[in-house]
From Swiss-Prot:
Listed InterPro entries: COMT-like, O_MeTrfase_dom, Plant_O-MeTrfase_dimerisation, SAM-dependent_MTases_sf, WH-like_DNA-bd_sf, WH_DNA-bd_sf
Gene: OMT
Family membership noted in the UniProt record: Belongs to the class I-like SAM-binding methyltransferase superfamily. Cation-independent O-methyltransferase family.
Record's protein name: Cephaeline 6'-O-methyltransferase CiOMT
Entry-linked Gene3D superfamilies: Vaccinia Virus protein VP39, Winged helix-like DNA-binding domain superfamily/Winged helix DNA-binding domain
Organism: Carapichea ipecacuanha (Ipecac)
Pathway: Alkaloid biosynthesis
Reported function: O-methyltransferase involved in the biosynthesis of ipecac and benzylisoquinoline monoterpenoid-isoquinoline alkaloids natural products, starting by the condensation of dopamine and secologanin, and including emetine and cephaeline, drugs used both as anti-protozoal (e.g. treatment of ameobiasis) and as emetic agents. Catalyzes successively the 7'-O-methylation of 7'-O-demethylcephaeline to produce cephaeline, and its 6'-O-methylation to produce emetine.
Keyword entries, A-Z: Alkaloid metabolism, Cytoplasm, Methyltransferase, S-adenosyl-L-methionine, Transferase
Activity regulation, short description: Inhibited by Co(2+), Ni(2+), Zn(2+) and Mn(2+) ions.
CDD domains: AdoMet_MTases (cd02440)
GO terms of molecular function: O-methyltransferase activity; protein dimerization activity
Record-annotated active site: 254 (proton acceptor)
Amino acid sequence: METVQSSSSAELLRAQTHFSTQLFSFQNYASLKCALHLGIPDAIKQHGKPMNLSELTSALPIKPSKAPYIHRLMRMLVKAGYFAQENECFDLTPIGLLLLKDDPINIRALVLLELHPALLLPWIALSEWFQNDDATPFVTAHGKSFWDYTSRDPEFRKLFDEAMAGDSELISKVLVTEFKYVFEGLKSLVDVGGGNGTLARSIAKAFPNLKCTVFDLPEAVANEQGDGNLDFVAGDMFDRVPSADAILLKIVLHDWSDENCVKILKNCRKSIPVKDKGGKVIIIEGVVELEKNAGNEYAGLENLDMEMLVLYNSKERTKKEWAKLFSDAGFSDYKFIPALDSWCIIELTP
């Protein structure tokens, strides 16, 4: 085994550089959060063309005495790829376009959610959690589960729902264009855990003869209004799931333990017709092997798996792990349809 003393100077320098890059990467995200709070992406968009530093600082809600520091913030954000700089003017990059508040497809709320103190504190408590009997690092940090915390903090719940909605906009665009066949022939669909209905609205619009129902906890759907072939129903998926030709679970199961996933899936199975009559469950989730074979820069499931541990003590799953859940829940047939990088559409039939 090599030691520091036996390593070459070049190796040590590379190691230190790698370590520094990883360690200080948080500063990029903290700076991005600052940019969102100040409204920098939207200020550039509203300007209609690249902005010079003077124009930008004048458009931001900052103290005049702090204006000289904006160029240092922008320098970091340009290096991180969120903005572009040319001839002393700043513009949005394709990544930056995803940060616009009023664009339906955006990750602004997701960024703010991931950098919210409520989600950062459990990571700080991770080592403490390994040495205690708490169910999750989130409980160690806050004294209550993630879902209890969310139900008691309306502002945090709103941010969480907005983050999930932004994610659903992109997924829905792909689903109703490239994977329409998944929904063809269905007369009714229940989106379990569908939040404010972003995904279900897109499906309902694309399939006007398909009756779509969003089923979620009362606090998630209390302020939502149905329209045409879309309605909202309050309830708990651990108690029951409304009957339909198909049940949709978009990135729901990775929030839960194997035992709870089986409970959810069994309730879904009870609510759909038999296979010969077209009953099925449609799952959108990550599959670990697919990420390993993706061959791109998507850094996802290892990081997301750790987040599932920290927040819920749940996990991302392999095909083998998914198959066991399906079997335990009484499903005899399933197929994996690769969709977005490591994300899969999984069709289950009884």
